[in-house]
């Protein structure tokens, strides 16, 4: 018999991580998680402790869903994060978890729900569509071999690269300002608080190592790139992979080779740390046409994911 119950904080963290890790066995771009990784996530400003549910089949935990409400966002739009262990997919568990999440979001005053789906997971996509979700966005996970990093491909040589200094509050404040200014026209944008930027730079559980660099032109910081190494992912997948977690240039300085310069510096940083592969994710409809830049420096699309949305 299938039952769905609420997550109990302080009790269910090991269960949550066990199911989440098992559900990612067939995913190439996600690794397993551990309790020590979940706890830092809960320290993220705006983290939603409510809305988490676990599906149990004959007493065995087989799926989970988080009807995630961003407490810092005023758009009344919730995000459904759903995971089911592969051998239990397609048995009706996803539908019951989705319906539970939709009811939870509605009760909590949300007016719309979003959900993500791997483009290869046709069964889940069809379920979303049957429940009234509409496709609203596409994204790409891209990879490149760091042996193929090139130079002289249009990078701006007049731009200086300066590392962020973790003990300088001014640097953290500048990343916060740049991030909000650069991404303000993007899908699902809301301004990050300074506390969120600190979390992103220094506390994110995904990266044991992270480095961030400013692009400086005529004494002004006009963009940045942030790269990181997820050691657990690399060990589990038996790869030496680093990630470009964020890169951006202020609007008035785009199309001048500055993004290319930042990308190449980030890739060389990962390569110098012994990485052999770089990974990033991009919104296919990014208004800055970032996908074109990434292809220019050598990235190729490995997989697609879709964002779906419906009114409540």
What are the roles of these predicted feature ranges?
Residues 54, 80-90, 247-254, 284:
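A short, internal acetyl-CoA/4′-phosphopantetheine-binding micro-motif in the GNAT/acyltransferase core
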Residues 20-57, 61-68, 189-217, 222-226, ...:
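Active-site rim helix/loop that mediates acceptor-substrate recognition in acyltransferases
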Residues 77, 105-118, 270-282:
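Conserved GNAT acetyl-CoA-binding A-motif
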Residues 69-80, 89, 209, 231-244, ...:
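A conserved beta-turn-beta hairpin within the catalytic core of GNAT-like acetyltransferases
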Residues 140-166, 276-279, 283-291, 297-312:
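C-terminal "cap" of GNAT-fold acetyltransferases
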Residues 1-39, 154-192:
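Short amphipathic alpha-helix that is part of the acyltransferase structural core
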Residues 90-103, 246-249, 255-268, 272, ...:
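Conserved acetyl-CoA-binding loop-helix of GNAT-fold acetyltransferases
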Residues 60, 71-73, 85-159, 306-310:
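Acyl-donor-binding surface of acyltransferase catalytic domains
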């Amino acid at each position: 018999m299938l039952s769905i119950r609420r997550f109990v904080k302080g009790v269910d963290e090991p269960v949550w991580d066990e199911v989440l890790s098992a559900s990612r066995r067939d995913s190439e771009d996600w690794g397993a998680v551990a309790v020590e990784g979940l706890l830092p996530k809960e320290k993220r400003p705006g983290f939603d402790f409510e809305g988490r549910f676990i599906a149990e089949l004959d007493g065995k935990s087989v799926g989970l869903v988080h009807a995630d409400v961003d407490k810092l966002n005023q758009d009344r739009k919730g995000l459904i994060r759903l995971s089911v262990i592969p051998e239990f997919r397609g048995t009706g568990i996803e539908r019951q978890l989705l319906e539970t999440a939709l009811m939870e979001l509605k009760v909590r005053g949300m007016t719309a729900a979003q959900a993500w789906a791997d483009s290869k997971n046709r069964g889940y996509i069809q379920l979303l569509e049957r429940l009234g979700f509409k496709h609203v966005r596409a994204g790409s996970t891209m990879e490149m071999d760091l042996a193929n990093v090139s130079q002289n491909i249009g990078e701006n040589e007049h731009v200086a690269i300066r590392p962020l200094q973790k003990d300088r509050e001014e640097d953290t404040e500048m990343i916060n300002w740049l991030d909000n200014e650069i991404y303000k026209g993007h899908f699902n944008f809301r301004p990050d608080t300074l506390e969120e930027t600190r979390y992103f730079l220094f506390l994110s559980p995904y990266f044991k190592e992270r480095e961030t660099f400013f692009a400086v032109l005529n004494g002004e910081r006009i963009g940045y790139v942030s790269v990181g190494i997820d050691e657990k992912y690399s060990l589990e997948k038996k790869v030496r992979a680093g990630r470009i977690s964020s890169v951006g240039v202020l609007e008035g300085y785009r199309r001048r080779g500055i993004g290319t310069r930042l990308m190449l510096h980030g890739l060389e940083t990962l390569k110098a740390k012994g990485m052999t592969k770089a990974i990033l994710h991009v919104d296919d409809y990014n208004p800055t046409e970032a996908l074109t830049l990434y292809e220019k420096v050598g990235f190729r699309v490995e997989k697609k994911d879709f964002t779906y949305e419906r009114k409540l």
